[in-house]
Amino acid sequence: MSLLYEVRGLVRRYGRVTALDLPALGVDELRIHSGQGLTLVGYNGSGKSTLLRLLAFLEEPDEGRIIYHGGEDPRREVSLLLQEPYLLKTTVFENVVLGLKLRGRRDGLEDAYQAAMRQVGFD
């Protein structure tokens, strides 16, 4: 199995939430290989979702590095699907085309939106 991610000295903070200024997530070192199974276990608020958002490059770490070895642009190859469905508090259009925008697509969004609407019977 080839190395997919290297994580070193990763810290993510969401503002000062306690007098101790504890980070939401702290990872000294983590290596993830292609095809490897990985289970994240922890209490609510322990940083599991934060780590996934960082690995999907949806957020930036406050400290440390995430090195992705899978290809040139991880935002085109990595996605995150959460267990609970979530809609942004915006328009249906923006929710439907969000994935395309995150991957850098700017052209043809209206056509993609219309095709998606037809696919689910909203034509």
Please describe what each predicted stretch is:
Residues 108-123:
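Conserved ABC ATPase "signature" region
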